[in-house]
């Protein structure tokens, strides 16, 4: 594989020589950093099983190599990447897989290790959504996930990925993660803190990642990480599991941050060893039981993962100084709720008791029941999924609800050809040879929902959201 020129500050190389265990070769580390990163994907099991996905893509000639720590994860090699980017394939557009670096699948694997089944989870630094969507798949879209992102510009991307993957059990917030320990004390069964870091492990993807690196910045970042971890630990219930991870390699931002928590809270912190997380995990195992993944070990990005359990309750942090404000939604119950449910079921939108109906003016939403106890304690950017807007003639069903809730075997489902599906993604109306009989149509391709539409005569009127419409070459090879 071709090498690329990576910028390494001398002080960084000195630090890595000190941090790297004697069992690893420093020359192999440098060589691995200069190799381009292997591409990898994670199959979205909310929409398709691993076996069915592999059967679906078998004719394409893709070469898939299993990732040891994620049953749904594969390294991928394709001959047609230049002709058709992976993100423009039909399977990606319909949310059947997520393009995700292999190392970044490790934290969620650790979070659910040892048959852990949390019902309320927080992803404290969630964008762009790879780990949130992985958590949702492991939870089977049940329970609830609070997905927080501090960067306002990245919240929109986070929501887009959650929506594409058909996820219904999330609430989005936009806060500095340091508020949650005070705002939501001991409210979560499990928390993932994939902390902001110096990014030393990503040089295979970005050869200039270390251009602004300095030992001093590592220490500044570690101070922020300690505050975030402290907040996360306070938000975790006693007995709950917390995973701390970074995509960096120095000990100050990794082992030292976790050891600081242990020194601060002593017996309240138990480190849970990760040596049995997957075969060969012991090659990256630290004496504390963490995984310190140098890129040459598994031929992936550099990464760090620690898992711990909260053994006892902690004194509360000072109350947050912000005001939440009035909650603008009211529960929808009784006859009204029944009417909405029956109307939704009639067009193929189905849900269970894990989701509850709420209303704001003419909008109807579905909130995960597990998140309702947090209402009034924190301000949400977006909660659950928007199901519909009511109007005089009924309901205007929303695209994100269709992707998350539609039953592709419903009587109104209408399977498109590849050419028709591509036209759909381009925002164009469909003119099938044999139009559907029903006026309300659940449009599908590869038996996956693409949207709800109206049949007008022989034409299916396109309802694909304008902001999602695609141009350029798509999966049939036509521009």
From Swiss-Prot:
GO MF: RNA binding; rRNA (cytosine-C5-)-methyltransferase activity
One GO process term, biological-process aspect: rRNA base methylation
Keyword field: Cytoplasm, Methyltransferase, RNA-binding, rRNA processing, S-adenosyl-L-methionine, Transferase
Recorded GO CC terms: cytoplasm
Catalyzed reactions: cytidine(1407) in 16S rRNA + S-adenosyl-L-methionine = 5-methylcytidine(1407) in 16S rRNA + S-adenosyl-L-homocysteine + H(+)
Positions contributing to S-adenosyl-L-methionine binding: 125-131, 149, 176, 194
Active site, UniProt feature: 247 (nucleophile)
PROSITE patterns from the UniProt entry: NOL1_NOP2_SUN, SAM_MT_RSMB_NOP
Pfam families: Methyltr_RsmB-F (PF01189), Methyltr_RsmF_N (PF17125), Methyltranf_PUA (PF13636), YebU_pre-PUA_dom (PF21150)
Its EC number(s): 2.1.1.178
UniProt subcellular location: Cytoplasm
Transmembrane segments: none
Main enzyme class: transferase
HAMAP family noted in UniProt: 16SrRNA_methyltr_F (MF_01579)
Family membership noted in the UniProt record: Belongs to the class I-like SAM-binding methyltransferase superfamily. RsmB/NOP family.
Function: Specifically methylates the cytosine at position 1407 (m5C1407) of 16S rRNA.
PANTHER family per UniProt: 28S RRNA (CYTOSINE(4447)-C(5))-METHYLTRANSFERASE-RELATED (PTHR22807:SF30), NOP2 YEAST -RELATED NOL1/NOP2/FMU SUN DOMAIN-CONTAINING (PTHR22807)
Protein name per the record: Ribosomal RNA small subunit methyltransferase F
Source species: Salmonella schwarzengrund (strain CVM19633)
